């Protein structure tokens, strides 16, 4: 049997789940316990569902047992119906109606409360995961793709609902039914029932073998589903680039490869699942056949020919024995669901247990002038040194442009200023206070970011501009920000003005329009420090001119740190910091640096692109 199961190949083809491999049974047990703790506070739902299941199963088992008295006492000698037997039959009929009513009530109660329990657990998981994602550090999102994370939030949680609803109701309802049927069999004939005990060890051995197989298959399937989701999300997001560069076939092959692996794992799960029930039924059938041979050989006592097995007890015993196969089959099938849930739960708890963004500060600054001082800053991604000994002094109200080749550390520096990463050495001071001493919320309340890749939300213009502000924002304030960002003219032309939905990431707007909405958002926040990762190189001349005017409006009232790509920005900056290999190699005003004839001069001559 084990060899038969081992033929179902479980080898992973490079897929990896978020949390890594389960290493031992203790870890599996811990996951089970943690999953059960999620329903601990809903014990009354579980109790009511269990009571309903007991009523349901007890009614089913009792109806099967009624075969015994009906056959033994419901008919007279020779199989006819007498007055006495007719009374018994009528009583049995009334009893069956009562049992069916009890069964119906039990079925409703168990399914309703178990279903509600499952939905409550999934609701809680999705809320907890989403809340946790809001607190996770940038390193988490660097390690895991968007598709993988979304798959955990949606697909994995769906697997848990199967364990907390379908699986639990199957275990409770079919489990109590099996117990009830065993009782019926022992009451009908304890001698025959003893033969059924031999099936236990065989079933236990079989189930223990397939448990590990199911768990590995489930883990591989969930991991590959994350890859499928990621590739699909990547394709949808970058559909223009894929078509422009003629990469449809390449991207399709990548998606199909992930899909093929997911399909193969699911087919292996189906094969293993399909193998389980027939084997169990064969074992049970052999036991039943053995019981029939026993009856034929030992069914009568010596001497008077009387039997220890009546027609009624024989019929009720075998009715129960036949009926027990289906719930046993259901119980073995639920193992597939439970193993999927365990694998899914592992990744869910990995996210929930992942260390949150480190909060090192406790101070809060009510008002900030915007003085930013960077002292001997160093940072590395693993073994790769990105910044080394960077020192820059930025006065309040200044516009400082950072220039340098790609990979020189400019963007990383701005991520450290906003504490998405924490420096390994050195310090960054905001108005003389180390940013690590400030709470994350307080520090970021003094910062605005206009990123190179503008990120807008599938919402209205108004909500995108007022995004993140805790106070009520009037339409007049939003319109004022739009005017200062040179965006109000085109917004007025939209179908619903500032209440127009702009689509996924502002897909209904042009590049320049999206840029100006982002600038209007920063204007409304009115933070004393602006981090601007310039992207005007992607715009046409007219859009660039309009955006540049909007930027001038924005930078008048704050300290501006610019990752510069355009000559116009560099020329107008109060200070230019030239970076190379993670170090500051030159610093000064535009004309001063040109006269030095160094790296800045070469970058300037090449257009700074």
From Swiss-Prot:
GO terms, molecular function: ABC-type transporter activity; ATP binding; ATP hydrolysis activity; ATPase-coupled lipid transmembrane transporter activity
Q: Which species does this protein come from?
A: Francisella tularensis subsp. tularensis (strain FSC 198)
ABC transmembrane type-1 domain location is 47-340
Protein name, please?
A: ATP-dependent lipid A-core flippase
Q: Name one GO cellular component term.
A: plasma membrane
Query: What membrane topology is annotated for this entry?
Result: Multi-pass membrane protein
Which spans are transmembrane here?
A: 47-67, 88-108, 167-187, 190-210, 279-299, 305-325
Q: Its catalytic activity?
A: ATP + H2O + lipid A-core oligosaccharideSide 1 = ADP + phosphate + lipid A-core oligosaccharideSide 2
């Amino acid at each position: 049997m084990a060899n038969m199961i081992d033929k179902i190949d479980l080898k992973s083809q490079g897929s990896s789940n978020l949390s890594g491999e389960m290493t031992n049974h203790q870890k599996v047990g811990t996951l089970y316990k943690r999953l059960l703790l999620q329903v601990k506070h809903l014990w009354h739902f579980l109790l009511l569902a269990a009571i309903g299941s007991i009523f349901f199963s007890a009614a089913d088992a009792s109806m099967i047992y009624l075969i015994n008295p009906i056959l033994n006492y419901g008919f007279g000698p020779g199989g006819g119906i007498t007055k006495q037997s007719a009374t018994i039959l009528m009583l049995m009929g009334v009893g069956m109606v009562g049992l069916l009513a009890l069964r119906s009530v039990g079925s409703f109660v168990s399914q309703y409360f178990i279903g509600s329990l499952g939905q409550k657990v999934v609701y809680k998981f999705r809320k907890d995961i989403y809340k946790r994602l809001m607190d996770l550090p940038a390193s988490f999102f660097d390690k895991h793709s968007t598709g993988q994370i979304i798959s955990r939030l949606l697909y994995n949680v769906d697997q848990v609902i199967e364990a907390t609803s379908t699986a639990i109701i199957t275990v409770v309802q079919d489990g109590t039914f099996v117990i009830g049927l065993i009782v019926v069999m022992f009451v009908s004939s304890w001698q025959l029932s003893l033969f059924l005990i031999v099936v236990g060890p065989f079933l236990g051995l079989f189930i223990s073998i397939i448990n590990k197989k199911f768990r590995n298959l489930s883990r591989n399937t969930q991991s590959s589903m994350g890859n499928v989701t990621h590739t699909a999300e990547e394709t949808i997001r970058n559909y223009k680039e894929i078509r422009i560069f003629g990469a449809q076939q390449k991207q399709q092959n990548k998606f199909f490869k992930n899909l093929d692996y997911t399909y193969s794992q699911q087919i292996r799960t189906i094969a293993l699942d399909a193998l389980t029930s027939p084997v169990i039924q064969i074992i049970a059938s052999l036991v039943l056949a053995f019981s029939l041979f026993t009856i034929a050989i030992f069914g009568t006592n010596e001497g008077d020919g009387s039997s220890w097995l009546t027609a009624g007890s024989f019929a009720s015993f075998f009715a129960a024995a036949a009926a027990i196969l289906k719930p046993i089959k259901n119980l073995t099938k639920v193992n597939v669901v439970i193993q999927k849930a365990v694998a899914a739960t592992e990744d869910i708890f990995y996210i929930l247990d992942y260390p949150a963004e480190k909060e090192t500060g406790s101070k809060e600054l009510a008002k900030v002038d915007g003085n930013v001082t960077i002292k001997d800053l160093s940072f590395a991604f693993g073994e790769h040194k990105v910044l080394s000994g960077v020192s820059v002094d930025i006065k309040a109200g200044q516009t400082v442009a950072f220039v340098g080749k790609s990979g020189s550390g400019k963007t990383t520096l701005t991520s450290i200023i906003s504490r998405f990463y924490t420096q390994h050495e050195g310090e960054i001071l905001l108005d003389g206070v180390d940013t690590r001493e400030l709470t994350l919320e307080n520090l970021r309340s003094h910062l605005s970011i206009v990123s190179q890749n503008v990120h807008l939300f599938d919402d209205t213009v108004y909500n995108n501009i007022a995004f993140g502000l805790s106070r009520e924002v009037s339409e007049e304030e939003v319109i004022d920000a739009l005017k200062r960002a040179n965006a109000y003219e085109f917004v007025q032309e939209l179908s619903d003005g500032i209440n127009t939905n702009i689509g996924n990431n502002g897909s209904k707007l042009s590049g320049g329009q999206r840029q100006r909405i982002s600038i209007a958002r920063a204007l409304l926040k009115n933070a004393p420090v602006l981090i601007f990762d310039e992207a005007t190189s992607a715009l046409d001349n007219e859009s660039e001119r309009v955006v540049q005017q909007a930027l001038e409006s924005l930078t008048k009232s704050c300290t501006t740190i610019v990752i510069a790509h355009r000559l116009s920005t560099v020329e107008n900056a109060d200070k230019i910091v030239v970076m190379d290999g993670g170090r500051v190699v030159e610093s000064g005003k535009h004309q001063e640096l040109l006269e030095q004839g160094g790296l800045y001069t070469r970058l300037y001559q090449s257009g700074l692109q």
